[in-house]
Amino acid sequence: MLIPHHLLEAETLTRLIEDFVTREGTDNGEETPLESRVLRVRQALERGEALILFEPDSQQCQLVAKRDVPKEWLD
């Protein structure tokens, strides 16, 4: 299930983004400040390039690129 980012409380969204950008394997080998990485993801959400996917079975949220979401989920 896709969750519109604007429906989340600001603090919840920030924590979700911070969790995503600090996961192992998400850095690009550079020492980019956390604030910059959070801002990039927030902007991608606002542009619709990234989406929040909630999986009810596992009760997990994840950020995904829109291009990786099945087209039928976007209708």
Swiss-Prot record:
It holds the Pfam family UPF0270. It comes from the Bacteria. InterPro entries: UPF0270 (IPR010648), YehU-like_sf (IPR036685). Coiled coil: none annotated. NCBIfam families: PRK00304.1. HAMAP family: UPF0270. Belongs to the UPF0270 family. This is UPF0270 protein Avin_35000. It comes from Azotobacter vinelandii (strain DJ / ATCC BAA-1303).
